[in-house]
């Protein structure tokens, strides 16, 4: 009866607890069961899942040989008012059961439970049905498998501290849960302790009846423990398997639960992972002598890989293996056989420490990360699972995919493996990877193009190539349009200067020979044809013996002269490979069609050059035979004779001077440094190489290195100290950097364009104040053309007049008695009638000269209607000159010219300028056309951009004056320059002079940018604002000596700077004319002069280096001798 009553009261209490669990949000289906007071919070109940029962308790009960045959166990208290009844599910099989819910995917077991231990003898129930409901722990029926983390195999020196499970009881006074703490077990004396919080493993082991210690705790409601003693020494047991004092082994405990007692002290018998297959049903392990092979059965030999752990859908995090991140569904590296791998005690990983205490959450996470981080090992893959064995888990993030894919076996091809090449795994003696040099496949450009082109060249029946000239016998013509080569004909278009355009069509069937030279510096083709072709060309091109264009003294049918047997086509540039293949294919097909053997042939450069030289020599001899030719033909003869002479000297063929100037050669060879100027230890040295020296060859453009070098050489070598202190020369890169566009920068978004420009070059003047200088030289390069900008007197705010040191009062009184008064008079005091009356004789004199441009009365009227802001001194000088002409109107023109020439001669030594008023400078027609076109563009631009134009005078804006033939402006300027010595004062005003050797349109934008730079620089240096507008800082484009080719612009820039100090400008009133600043013949030797300077510096610097080396060698020898002498003396 008492048992029935107690059973009924226990059932009632259980139903009440069941009702409470159903009222919770999890519905009572969680795998943590706790029975507590009704006022307990849900959070506390959730934490009790790990504190309900301990597997250690059931171990103690199983060790006594008790077996559970009931589906439930009733634990009664001494008071009889509470009975704890625990329901567990039993599995139909003897395998293990996987525990879920662990956040790191590990199955935690109790202490001292090896994976090799079995649970034979415990039959798990399938569940318990109460009131129509089945109670279980929300786990599947699959057999449980304990992972390596559940083994809890600690090294001997590690203490293990366990938290005993919490025993629950129901007291009348509402007693709370009390914990029982077992004393920590230790293998060796060590300070390392591990705290393991146990969880319930009801699905893995059958819950046994409570141990006597547990019953005692529940009965007396106190924390106590039943102590056991060693049967041999009588001391208290601290370990259930071995006595710590005498070392005796407890055999009864070793055989409990039919587990094999495998200790870590045994070096043999490696700890193996569990198989992924469950043991055969009904097979049970023996109590003693259980080996790994018997425990796993044949599955160990068949399955060499670990289990594929399927992750929950909610845990699609990246899985780390061997320190690398593998995406979900990714392939896992190949796993090796665990039987072949052994591990020592020192290689064991630390187990994970779990605790339900909230205060230790952070520490647990840190330790968990440390324990899961793989150690460097020579295994193919390191698993994130901490274990003591050879852990090689093949992880797959996709659960569905893992279930569908069959498990791999050694017999199956390993498709999910990543194999590293053997060469990549090779290591040297030190264990480092062997880095083999990257071998690049050598690509033969010739072979790469020949194959595809040779297959498709039959599809090309014609090719258009650019040719620069043609020679037919002794006839030479330049070609403007390209030549068309086809299988049927060769079409050449000639545009004669005096005749109508002619189209020459050579039928390929009439050709007898084609010789081809495809050298980069001389690509040329020599064609030979039947005599009828020469006769046709002679008529078509109007060749005659009188003109000596084609001399066939021996008859057309008996052509023996070398120069008359070829039709020569000289190409613009060397053909690329594709064009060459097509061209040669067409010529080869022509020879096949004409059935001519050896029709196409390639010749060397020397042979091609000798043929061209022979053609030119023959032409010169034919010209010498006819001395009674017309004047224009004589010019042509002399023109061609120059070519012949150059060909003799250089053994190189050029068509004419223009072509020779345009033919640029490319520097080939190793680059070697010649000099550093100034040499060390001076700062700012410029290195000049042999490649830079190549730029000084005729026809080559000067580069920035030569420009910067020579400008620095002028300042340091040729200028006086006081002159060098008055100037500042910017680098040739200054303006480019000033005007360079940059990417958007958040720091400069609020700055203006002027400030952004200045910010790029603000450090260029950190050591100099440019406003204290008189002249600032800025070399500029735009569109591959060099020109010079000179900022004059940037520190002045207005024009400044100073006494003229070269003023001659006697000369002024003799020529113009009123000149002194007119120099100080204003524009309103000038007589307009005298200017009008003097203008006509001047124009008449200019019209009488055949080399001057026609000047109409409208131009004179334009001069008279100039704005009032024109400089007074210039107007006074013009009026003085015109008055002088009016006085001498009745005299002969020669007298007036001689008088002007005398004045110019007298002022030559004083001003450093020689002005020949009526000399004309001839330039090539092409340059004249370009300048005229630029002049027209500048005139149009002046109308459109009146506000942007710098303050250029009428001579720059007038198209006629922009050309070199505008001598009216030259004459006016010459009188101004020639009469500098007649003025008592000279003007110094802030201005920007642009000196261009190839005058074109006004470069107003350059002056504008320089003005804006000066404004910001003034604000930065002086701390105040100042305007550098066109009213304050005027811009002018003075007339300077002009180049007669297209490559000497840089040489002229250097000469402008040099002449600025050799023949200084005294008066800076605008406009100014410097056309005769230096003699033109000097420019022909300027390149050679700079070259010689560099070579001399190289020689001197090489000598200095040699002397320095010799001195160092002598010093080292002397030191060595002294050391030797001292050493020998000490030994004696």
Curated annotation (Swiss-Prot):
Active site, per annotation: 785, 936, 1049
Gene name of the record: Senp6
UniProt xrefs under PROSITE patterns: ULP_PROTEASE (PS50600)
InterPro entries: Papain-like_cys_pep_sf, Peptidase_C48_C, Sentrin-specific_protease
Annotated source species: Mus musculus
Assembly and oligomerization: Interacts with RXRA. Forms a complex with KAT5-TIP60 and UBE2I in response to UV irradiation. Interacts with RPA1 to maintain it in hyposumoylated state during S phase preventing DNA repair initiation.
Phosphoserine PTM positions: 41, 355-356, 371, 373, 938, 1131
Region spans: Disordered: 23-51, 327-388
GO CC terms in record: nucleus; postsynaptic cytosol; presynaptic cytosol
Span list, region Protease: 686-1132
Designated name of the protein: Sentrin-specific protease 6
Taxonomic lineage from the root: Eukaryota, Metazoa, Chordata, Craniata, Vertebrata
């Amino acid at each position: 009866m008492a048992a029935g009553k107690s059973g009924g009261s226990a059932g009632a209490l259980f139903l009440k607890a069941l009702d409470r669990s159903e009222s919770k949000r999890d519905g009572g289906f969680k795998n943590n069961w706790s029975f507590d007071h009704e006022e307990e919070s849900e959070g506390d109940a959730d934490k009790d899942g790990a504190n309900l029962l301990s597997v250690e308790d059931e171990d103690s009960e199983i060790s006594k040989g008790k077996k559970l045959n009931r589906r439930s166990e009733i634990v009664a208290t001494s008071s009889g008012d509470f009975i704890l009844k625990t329901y567990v599910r039993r599995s139909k099989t003897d395998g293990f059961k996987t525990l879920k819910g662990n956040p790191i995917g590990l199955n935690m077991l109790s202490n001292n439970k090896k994976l090799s231990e079995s649970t034979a003898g415990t039959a798990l129930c399938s569940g318990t049905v109460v009131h129509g409901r089945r109670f279980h722990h929300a786990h599947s029926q699959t057999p449980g498998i304990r992972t390596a983390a559940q083994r809890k195999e600690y090294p001997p020196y590690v203490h293990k501290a366990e938290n005993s499970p919490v025993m629950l009881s129901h007291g009348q006074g509402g007693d709370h849960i009390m914990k029982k703490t077992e004393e920590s077990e230790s293998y060796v004396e060590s300070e390392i302790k591990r705290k393991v919080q146990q969880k319930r493993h009801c699905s893995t082991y059958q819950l046994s009846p409570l141990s006597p210690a547990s019953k005692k705790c529940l009965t007396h409601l106190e924390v106590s423990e039943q102590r056991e003693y060693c049967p041999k020494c009588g001391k208290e047991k601290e370990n259930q398997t071995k006595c710590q004092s005498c070392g005796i082994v407890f055999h009864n405990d070793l055989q409990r639960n039919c587990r094999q007692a495998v200790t870590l002290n045994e070096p043999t018998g490696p700890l193996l992972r569990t198989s992924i297959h469950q043991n055969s049903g009904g097979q049970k392990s023996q109590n003693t002598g259980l080996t790994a092979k018997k425990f796993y059965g044949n599955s160990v030999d068949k399955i060499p890989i670990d289990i594929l752990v399927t992750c929950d859908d909610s845990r699609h995090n990246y899985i780390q293996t061997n320190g690398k991140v593998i995406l979900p569904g990714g392939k896992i590296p190949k796993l090796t056989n665990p039987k072949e791998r052994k591990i020592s005690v020192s290689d064991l990983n630390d187990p994970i420490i779990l605790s339900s205490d909230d205060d230790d959450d952070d520490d647990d996470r840190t330790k968990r990360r440390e324990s899961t981080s793989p150690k460097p090992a020579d295994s193919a893959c390191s698993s994130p699972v901490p274990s003591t064995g050879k852990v090689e888990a093949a992880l797959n993030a996709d659960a569905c995919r893992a279930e569908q894919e069959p498990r791999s076996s050694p017999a199956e091809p390993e498709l999910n493996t990543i194999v590293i090449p053997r060469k990549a795994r090779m290591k040297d003696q030190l264990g480092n990877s062997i880095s083999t040099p990257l071998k690049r496949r050598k690509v033969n450009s010739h072979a790469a193009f020949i194959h595809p082109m040779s297959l498709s060249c039959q599809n090309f029946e014609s090719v258009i190539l650019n040719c620069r000239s043609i020679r037919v016998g002794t006839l030479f013509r330049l070609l403007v349009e390209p030549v068309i080569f086809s299988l049927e004909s060769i079409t050449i278009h000639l545009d004669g200067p005096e005749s109508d355009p002619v189209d020459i069509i050579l039928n390929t069937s009439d050709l007898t020979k084609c010789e081809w030279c495809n050298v980069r510096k001389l690509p040329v083709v020599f064609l030979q044809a039947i005599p009828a072709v020469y006769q046709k060309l002679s008529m078509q091109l109007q060749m005659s013996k009188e003109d000596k264009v084609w001399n066939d003294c021996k008859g057309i049918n008996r052509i023996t002269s070398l120069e008359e047997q070829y039709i020569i086509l000289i190409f613009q540039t060397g053909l690329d490979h594709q064009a060459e293949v097509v061209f040669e294919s067409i010529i080869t097909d022509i020879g096949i069609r004409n059935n001519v053997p050896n029709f196409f042939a390639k010749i060397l450069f020397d042979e091609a050059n000798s043929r061209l030289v022979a053609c030119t020599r023959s032409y010169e001899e034919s010209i010498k035979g006819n001395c009674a030719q017309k004047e224009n033909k004589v010019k042509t003869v002399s023109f061609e004779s120059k070519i012949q002479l150059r060909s003799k000297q250089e053994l190189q063929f050029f068509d004419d001077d223009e072509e020779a100037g345009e033919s640029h050669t490319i520097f080939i060879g190793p680059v070697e440094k010649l000099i550093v100027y100034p040499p060390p230890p001076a700062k700012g040295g410029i290195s000049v190489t042999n490649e830079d020296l190549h730029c000084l060859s005729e026809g080559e453009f000067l580069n920035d290195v030569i420009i910067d070098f020579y400008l620095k050489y002028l300042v340091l070598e040729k200028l006086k100290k006081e002159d060098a202190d008055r100037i500042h020369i910017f680098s040739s890169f200054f303006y480019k950097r000033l005007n360079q566009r940059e990417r958007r920068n958040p720091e400069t978004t609020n700055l203006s364009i002027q400030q952004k420009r200045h910010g790029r070059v603000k450090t260029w003047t950190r050591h100099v104040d440019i406003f204290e200088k008189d002249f600032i030289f800025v070399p500029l390069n735009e569109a591959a053309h060099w020109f010079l900008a000179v900022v004059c007197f940037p520190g002045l705010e207005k024009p400044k007049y100073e006494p003229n040191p070269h003023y001659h009062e006697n000369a002024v009184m003799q020529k113009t008695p009123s000149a002194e008064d007119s120099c100080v008079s204003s524009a309103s005091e000038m007589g307009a009638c005298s200017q009008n009356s003097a203008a006509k004789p001047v124009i008449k004199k200019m019209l009488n000269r055949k080399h001057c441009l026609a000047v109409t009365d409208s131009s004179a009227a334009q001069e008279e209607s100039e704005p009032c802001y024109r400089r007074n001194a210039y107007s006074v000088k013009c009026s003085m000159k015109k008055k002088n002409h009016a006085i001498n109107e009745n005299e002969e023109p020669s007298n007036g010219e001689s008088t002007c020439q005398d004045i110019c001669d007298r002022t030559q030594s004083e001003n450093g300028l020689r002005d020949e008023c009526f000399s004309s400078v001839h330039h090539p027609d092409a340059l004249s056309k370009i300048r005229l076109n630029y002049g027209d563009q500048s005139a149009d631009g002046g109308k459109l951009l009146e506000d942007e134009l710098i303050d250029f005078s009428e001579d720059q804006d007038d198209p006629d004056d922009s050309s070199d033939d505008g001598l009216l402006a030259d004459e006016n300027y010459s009188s101004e320059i020639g009469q500098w010595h007649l003025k008592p004062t000279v003007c110094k005003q802030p201005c920007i002079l642009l000196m261009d050797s190839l005058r074109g349109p006004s470069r107003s934008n350059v002056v504008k940018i320089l003005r804006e730079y000066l404004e910001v620089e003034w604000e930065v240096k002086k701390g105040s604002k100042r305007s550098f507008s066109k009213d304050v800082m005027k811009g002018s484009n003075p007339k300077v000596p002009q180049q007669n080719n297209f490559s000497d612009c840089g040489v002229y820039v250097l000469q402008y700077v040099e002449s600025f100090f050799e023949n200084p400008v005294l008066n800076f009133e605008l406009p100014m004319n410097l056309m005769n600043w230096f003699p033109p013949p000097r420019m022909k030797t300027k390149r050679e002069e700079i070259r010689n300077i560099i070579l001399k510096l190289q020689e001197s610097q090489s000598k200095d280096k040699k002397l320095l080396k010799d001195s160092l060698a002598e010093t080292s020898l002397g030191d060595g001798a002294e050391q030797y002498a001292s050493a020998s003396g000490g030994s004696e």
